[in-house]
Amino acid sequence: MKLQFLRRVKMKSLLKKSFACLLLLLLGAFLGIYLQRNDSIKIYINSLLEEGILSYARSTDFHDVENSKVNLLEVRSIELSRDSDTYDTEIDSKYILRKREFNQARAAIILIDIWDTSKEPNDGFKERHESFVLNKIVPLINLARKHKIQVIHSPHSSPISKHVLIEPQDIVLEVDNLPFQMQSLYLHNLLKERGISTLLYAGNSTHKCLFDRPDGIYGMRKLMDDFILVRDATMAFEYHTTLEGELVKNVFTNYIEESYGTSTTINDLNMSLSSPESP
């Protein structure tokens, strides 16, 4: 009798646990379906998550970097013409060139989607990209390594070009399986650990991955505020109406120069790094 009683008690306990688990599963399924259909709730939860990430990111300081060399680097921004006193048009907008302090120990170059295009079906893009990697990206990487600037590789969807050699000191981001906000935070934490506060961007495509990926300029905009686009080390998959003159790349370069940061060139970066330290 006692054994049967204990078995009944155990069975009831097991049934209660099973029922509780079933309720939790049903509740989870209901919430999942509800969130998929309710955009306002999704937006609210996403904003809470983003605020939490920003709060955490701002709570820690960048590590100090000792004995770092500071030079002057020429950068470019764009100023839109909005003169209320005289007649002006959009063509009156102008580039602004200035020299800024550049601390190479606090800088990193992030290379977005430097693809292996050996299987690229568009022959013209494949040829342009091969030339771009050999004549722009490889020299930029060599320049960075010569001056001990951190090189970060961020490939998405395709392997890295066979022309780009990965060295032990390089960082290769492989976090595509994380939620977007976590990818941004992951990069941000890597940079903080190394005392890096300036990101130089290069790679593909100026108006897509380089800009709007979680580790792109737009994705990192709330976590950092010092972005420099290496404008002759970026390219875009152009449209048939824009290929001549690389209009997509150039227009989006202007957009970045207006709203998100500045740009420079490989040559300007080389001159800055090769010059004596600024007083």
Ranges and model annotations:
Residues 111-112, 149-156:
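Short beta-strand segments at enzyme active-site cores
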Residues 130-136:
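Aromatic- and glycine-enriched glycan-recognition loops and surfaces
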Residues 7-24:
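N-terminal Sec-pathway targeting helices
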Residues 32-108, 127, 138-139, 146-147, ...:
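Active-site-adjacent betaalpha module
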Residues 20, 26-33:
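N-terminal signal-anchor transmembrane helix specifying type II single-pass membrane topology
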Residues 107-125:
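Acidic/histidine-rich, surface-exposed loop or edge segments in extracytoplasmic proteins
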